[in-house]
Amino acid sequence: MDFFGPHLLAYFIATLHFLGTLAAIHAVLTVRTAQGSIAWALSLMFMPYLTLIPYLIFGRSTFDAYIQARRQANQEMHTAITALNWRPWVEEALAARNSSAYASLRAMPKLGRMPCLANNEVHLLINGDATFSAIFEAIRNARTAVLFQFFIIHDDELGRQLHALLKEKSAEGVAIYVLYDRIGSHALPHRYVQSLRDAGVQVKAFATRSGWLNRFQVNFRNHRKIVVVDGITGFVGGHNVGDEYLGKKPPLAPWRDTHVQVTGPVVACLQESFAEDWFWAARELPPLILPDAYPEDGVLCQLLASGPADPYETCSLFFVEAIHAATERVWITSPYFIPDEAVFAALRLAVLRGVDVRLLLPSRPDHRIVYAASSLYAIEAVRAGVRVFRYTPGFLHQKVVLVDSEISAIGSANMDNRSFRLNFEVMLLTVDEAFAKEVEHMLLDDFALAHEVSQEESRETRRLQQLGMRVARLISPIL
């Protein structure tokens, strides 16, 4: 006992460094990006007492067993869906190929593994009041089934309105399916969920895998926000269910976000995306509904659902393809700006082509380390010729892309490593000049409420502040 006493701390530190070395080797072998591998390996080698536990939580970005299990579940889901003769979009897909605008999206159907579909109708929903008024109205009018998926559901005023409405519709005989992310909705009380289940609502939490350790796994989160009512009306965008998304909670209020409402053949793609996630959580299919007929005209839409089990880094490639497609302008709004090398290079090249490249970012942080890393990338973007704007009234959370005069995309994907490689995301692309004009007007209103970062400001950043930003950027691949 006398021998171990003085040396116990030394043994403990040596053990931590040994485990850190093993974890560093694991990071080099498994983390998807070189930047992420280097960041994890160095921190695990030299500071294992600070980074070993976070690595177990954040670092397993290519957990092969999970990815294989998810792919197997997707295959089983598609086998089950084939038995339902789920062929909703043949005529609409052919119509899309005959469209002159189809060429601008030629890579997207292969990238997203879903067809580009014609004859859709889309409506822009600006901010929380418009979004949840439209969603709740659609649910009130539901007759058959409601598919409801959000990253975050809070037990607050808005969450309780949703709770009461879902119970009411379930009592009327409508099939209600609710899917929320276990980490994103970690504060949702059990009584909230159990009350819905007691009322006949099907509720599942999206989790990576079972097991004690995976309760702390914050990678592979389901960040999608999807609502489908009766297989006819769909919603997708950036909002979650909570009072802060209505701009009711300082210091981030007023909250700026965007959703889109859609009808037409692309709603079938929304249902299929929901079905994949529901099948993973429940090992059964939700009701999938096709309307008797679709409109004979409308706009071109492409759903892009991305996730860590994809054969490609779908979300990152989406941004690269959208930026490369621009000949006149590409305007992007995101709460976080931590691009990978491919996306940042695409932005640089767009500037060199003479494209009007603009980024709209928040002026206040919700996560300080992420904001610091984002700020350094924003400074570098300004120096590369990108026009960077900071939205000043409140927190900007919308995820919108506008390319030239026809192409727009609205959904859940941020411009950061987590959306690019670790989370499940969904974006709705629309090819239509009139809708793009609506998005343009919305963004022009946002730019009018924003402060443009000048070249001089980017040079005036204090050295200590720059040091903090660079440290934050160093760990940005693992944020």
UniProtKB/Swiss-Prot annotation:
The keyword Transit peptide does not apply. Pfam families: PLDc_2 (PF13091), PLDc_N (PF13396). It is an enzyme of class 2 (transferase). It catalyses: 2 a 1,2-diacyl-sn-glycero-3-phospho-(1'-sn-glycerol) = a cardiolipin + glycerol. The active site is at residues 223, 225, 230, 397, 399, 404. Keywords: Cell inner membrane, Cell membrane, Lipid biosynthesis, Lipid metabolism, Membrane, Phospholipid biosynthesis, Phospholipid metabolism, Repeat, Transferase, Transmembrane, Transmembrane helix. The chain crosses the membrane at residues 8-28, 38-58. Catalyzes the reversible phosphatidyl group transfer from one phosphatidylglycerol molecule to another to form cardiolipin (CL) (diphosphatidylglycerol) and glycerol. This is Cardiolipin synthase A. It comes from Pseudomonas fluorescens (strain SBW25). The lineage of its organism: Bacteria, Pseudomonadati, Pseudomonadota, Gammaproteobacteria, Pseudomonadales.
